[in-house]
């Protein structure tokens, strides 16, 4: 599942996870693929220091850090009441570089929040497409949101290893 350039093939890894899961897991392939992308994005954010000003929360946090069985779509964060967008300069390119590094056939588009956006939440929209993907299927899309709200009891928790095969491909 590792390419000649040292990247891993997340689609092959997801297929292996679904196959190992047994009958009835076939419909979950896109969900498992998205969860592997979540791991990759969170790893890149941690390596670049973006978690110093953010608290991971929401459904994906419950699944990846607290063991919830429910799959979730998006990545949600609390940035605090004094959240400053400047602390996240470079987040889009960090995500794009990390996901593009998964192979030559991976195309990543990150839509950044509008600089003049009002409100409490800033949203990045991440679209991932692979060359082998059928044109009639949509890209994997992940929304990353940062809300200007406090996190009342933040805890440092590692992401759980939902798929032991992933341990073979960590850098």
Ranges and model annotations:
Residues 99-142:
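Conserved catalytic core of two-metal-ion nucleotidyltransferases
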Residues 1-36:
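N-terminal regions immediately upstream of nucleotidyltransferase
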Residues 83, 87-99:
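A generic, well-ordered mixed alpha/beta core segment in the N-terminal half of proteins
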């Amino acid at each position: 599942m590792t390419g000649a350039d040292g990247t891993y093939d997340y689609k092959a890894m997801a297929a292996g996870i679904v196959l190992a899961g047994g009958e009835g897991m076939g419909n979950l392939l896109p969900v498992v693929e998205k969860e592997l992308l979540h791991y990759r994005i969170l790893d890149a954010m941690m390596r670049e220091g973006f978690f110093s000003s953010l608290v991971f929360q929401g459904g994906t946090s419950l699944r990846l850090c607290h063991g919830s069985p429910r799959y979730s779509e998006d990545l949600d964060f609390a940035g605090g009441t004094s959240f400053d967008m400047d602390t996240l300069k470079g987040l889009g390119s960090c995500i794009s570089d990390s996901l593009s590094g998964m192979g030559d056939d991976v195309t990543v588009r990150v839509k950044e929040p509008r600089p003049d956006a009002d409100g409490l939440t800033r949203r990045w929209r991440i679209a991932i497409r692979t060359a082998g993907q059928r044109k009639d299927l949509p890209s994997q899309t992940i929304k990353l949101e940062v809300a200007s709200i406090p996190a009342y009891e933040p805890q440092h928790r590692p992401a759980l290893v939902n798929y032991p095969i992933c341990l073979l491909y960590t850098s």
